[in-house]
Amino acid sequence: MNPIMIQAVNDDGQSIGEIEKIAAHENEGTWHRAISVFLFDAEGRLLIQQRSEAKYHFAGLWANSCCSHPTVDETIEHAAHRAMLHELGVYSNVKELAVVRYEATDPVTGHTEREHDHILIGVLTEEPNFNPSEVQAIRWVSLNGLRIEIEQQPEKFAPWLPIILKQVSFSS
């Protein structure tokens, strides 16, 4: 399998080159570009996924609808569409809502996220057909219910989810 090359970034989020995806998460991590997609249904509920146990970091934790890293020649929107199709088997128009920078280390694997994370939102009108190599479960939740759940059981959630929910307003 060919290595996946993603976009390394500086403190301002400007591309400064490329780095292999796994290498970007090793040791203390390297700042890199990422996307986090938040898909809502017509009732305003958010689709969240439980990450597969096969993931190389933060396996088995609940996260937003899907995440990925734009490859070196890929736009943010294309990366979002690729991730939605690969992880959830769906397509939705998305728009960028915000950018969040965060760092988080997986206590199990030692892999570190240092992400300049583009937050995208969309409305999903079809039923997801998730890829079990990426996702082990999905569910629809209200944002308020999700915030309460994260407060009560933070260990069940990927660390970027509460960070994004605190920094980004999802109200229409």
Residue ranges and their predicted role:
Residues 47-48, 63-97:
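The catalytic Nudix box helix
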Residues 1-36, 40-42:
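Acidic, metal-coordinating catalytic segment for phosphate/diphosphate chemistry
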Residues 34-66:
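A glycine-rich, hydrophobic loop/mini-helix early in the fold
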Residues 30, 55, 59, 72-73, ...:
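Hydrophobic alpha-helical segments and helix-packing faces
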Residues 37, 66, 96, 118-120:
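A structural signal for short, well-ordered beta-strand segments
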